[in-house]
């Protein structure tokens, strides 16, 4: 059985990246929450 996580840089960026987060209102909420929490890394 193959493993479920087969990492790809492009997919990671496109699905979880900063620009993807900024493109939707809910994504911006995610970033705002992570800023409020003081996360060093906001997105992939």
UniProtKB/Swiss-Prot annotation:
Pfam families: Ribosomal_L34. The keyword Ribosomal protein applies. Residues 1-22, 30-44 have a biased composition (Basic residues). Residues 1-44 are annotated as: Disordered. NCBIfam families: rpmH_bact (TIGR01030). This is Large ribosomal subunit protein bL34. HAMAP family: Ribosomal_bL34 (MF_00391). Transmembrane segments: none annotated. The keyword Ribonucleoprotein applies. Belongs to the bacterial ribosomal protein bL34 family. It comes from Leuconostoc citreum (strain KM20). The gene is rpmH. InterPro entries: Ribosomal_bL34, Ribosomal_bL34_CS. GO terms for molecular function: structural constituent of ribosome. Keywords: Ribonucleoprotein, Ribosomal protein. One of its GO terms (cellular component) is ribonucleoprotein complex. One of its GO terms (biological process) is translation.
